[in-house]
């Protein structure tokens, strides 16, 4: 990636990269937003002239100002909402790279960007949406969801066909993309970047409880919480009646908040500092994901924190050599054990 900062443009001009996402990354709410923020930090730190275009054109504080402090121009507000195509017409020839990572925003802006720029288009696949939806359809035995998956596959294939470079976090999805698009440049890249390593207290005899981390607005997370509480936790309580599950994640709907009890704490949104306290005191992170795609940020974060994990196969999918760190369990009895 370092060649991006030197191989475009000419003379002393910094190469310009336009980063397009559906909204300003709120990194303490969603794993995907944390990934986007880390990549924006990386790209700006490489010396690129980075411009950020949120598809909703909203300025969200403090996150927008934090991007500005990194030297990133944010193309937000009423003027850009009404005039983004004119801005592309006027400035497109100075854009060297365009970075997409969501199918909806790529679909909305890609044609205009192709018409107004000569930029190389990089698409970073957070996960294959069609694969996640197809797995959901299988779990729920719902043909309507499979129809939605088929629509997303057409959308994503069109985007991939019109991109110059494809990035993915998952080895599994890299293989799928290489098979479907053998002439494309496809690379697996890290989900998160960390500047240092934590030094947690390794005396797990002092720790207690279970921890689940994940935005409750994400349907696979809601399904995972419900399945764990309904099918797995009662089996755990037969052996460890005092076990408590802490659920961290913003935007919990009524179906999740209704699970709150002495044994299930629906904590909701927390700050990074509060989350660190939970990681430092928990005995085990659970990842009971039954359907999904891509690499799971909750798994990478737990590994970084040095906390043991119990996960399903889907939860561990796509991570290099993960079998040396955790053995997947897909049935309730095995997961509880």
Tell me what each language-model feature is.
Residues 88-107, 122:
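Short N-terminal targeting/anchoring amphipathic segment
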Residues 325-333:
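Conserved acidic donor-binding segment of nucleotide-sugar-dependent glycosyltransferases
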Residues 26, 118-119, 123-150, 175, ...:
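Acceptor-binding helix/loop patch of EC 2.4 sugar-transfer enzymes
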Residues 94-96, 164, 280-294, 305-308:
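Acidic donor-binding loop of glycosyltransferase active sites
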Residues 298-302, 308-312:
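Short hydrophobic beta-strand element within catalytic cores of glycosyltransferases
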Residues 1-33, 39, 63-70:
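Non-catalytic membrane-proximal stalk/linker segments that position and tether the catalytic domains
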Residues 28, 32-41, 52, 161, ...:
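Conserved catalytic-core segment of nucleotide-activated headgroup transferases in glycan assembly
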Residues 254-256, 275-276, 292-296, 314-320:
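Short glycine/proline-enriched, acidic/aromatic patches that form the donor-sugar handling elements
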